[in-house]
């Protein structure tokens, strides 16, 4: 099987939504209740990918996973902070591909001078918590019974990781659209799957 990681295209919206939809309808991993339309999902992709990396994992040309980061909080002092998200189709889970996808995402965020990564995970999603822990994330908090889905209250855990050095005055945040294409290609070209 051939795997490839690349940056998202708006035309990927339907294929990405196909990966995401079961997490909405069948699990408590996503706190959404209703699967968005392809058009709405494409708008989300456009909005996020203008500022932050949004990448997809393909298996023999089929999108089987994706990861992205987005602004964590709006105040200017949070410019170096992001929330990260990853979803993999069940058929590719447990193969180490999530770690590879996240590693690529981290390298792309480093090109933007991002420093602090946060992940919000449903408390009983042990596999995700363990994957994040294996990548250097630390548990920083639990929100008890923060969400209600599928007839039960769910805890949410927050995990965090710092990438790069924290200078006294950090370099400015660079929107993803302004990162040199050659640097993006260099990062993605070095991914071995």
Question: What does each model-identified segment do?
Answer:
Residues 165-193:
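Acidic/histidine-enriched, glycine/proline-rich intrinsically disordered or flexible terminal extensions
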Residues 109-121:
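Conserved GNAT acetyl-CoA-binding A-motif
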Residues 94-107, 130-134:
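Conserved acetyl-CoA-binding loop-helix of GNAT-fold acetyltransferases
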Residues 36-91, 102-103, 162-163:
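Acetyl-CoA-dependent GNAT
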């Amino acid at each position: 099987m051939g795997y490839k990681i690349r940056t998202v295209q708006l035309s990927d919206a339907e294929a990405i939504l196909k990966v995401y939809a079961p997490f909405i309808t069948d699990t408590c991993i996503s706190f959404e209740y209703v699967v968005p339309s392809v058009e709405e999902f494409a708008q989300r992709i456009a909005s996020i990918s203008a500022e932050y990396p949004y990448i997809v994992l393909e298996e023999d040309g089929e999108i089987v996973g994706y990861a992205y980061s987005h602004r964590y909080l709006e105040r200017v002092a949070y410019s170096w902070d992001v929330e990260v998200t990853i979803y993999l189709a069940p058929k590719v889970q447990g193969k180490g591909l999530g770690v590879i996808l996240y590693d690529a995402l981290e390298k792309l965020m480093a090109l933007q001078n991002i420093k602090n990564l946060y992940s919000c995970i449903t408390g009983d999603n042990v596999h995700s918590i363990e994957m994040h822990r294996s990548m250097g994330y630390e548990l920083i908090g639990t929100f008890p019974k923060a969400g209600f889905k599928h007839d039960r209250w769910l805890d949410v855990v927050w995990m965090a990781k710092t990438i790069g050095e924290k200078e006294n005055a950090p370099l400015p945040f660079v929107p993803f659209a302004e990162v040199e294409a050659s640097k993006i290609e260099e990062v993605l070209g070095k991914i071995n799957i």
